[in-house]
A protein has these predicted regions:
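Major-groove DNA-recognition helix of helix-turn-helix-type DNA-binding domains
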Residues: 15-42
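Basic Lys/Arg-rich amphipathic helical interaction modules
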Residues: 1-24, 46-79
Length: 79
């Protein structure tokens, strides 16, 4: 059975980022998470992580499209 929630440390490992970077994503609101238990362990719902990854793909595609457009404009000016 696939878990519904994963610890923030697992999120960091899955995204190949540090634990502090994963926590920064939560603090900024980019990645939704909840605190569970007496020690306040952060957990991220797997569907939230998947949504974050999808949004990151879309943002990257937008950045790349802007870069391509800038290159086309530069090439037009250089002619």
């Amino acid at each position: 059975m696939t878990p519904r929630f994963v610890p923030l440390s697992d999120v960091a490992e899955m995204l190949s980022i540090s634990a502090s970077q994963a926590y920064a994503l939560v603090r900024s609101g980019e990645l939704r998470a909840i605190k569970i238990g007496g020690r306040g362990q952060w957990r991220v719902e797997v569907t939230e992580l998947e949504s974050y990854i999808q949004r990151s793909y879309e943002a990257t595609a937008h950045i790349l499209e802007e870069e391509r457009e800038q290159e086309r404009q530069k090439a037009s000016r250089d002619r």
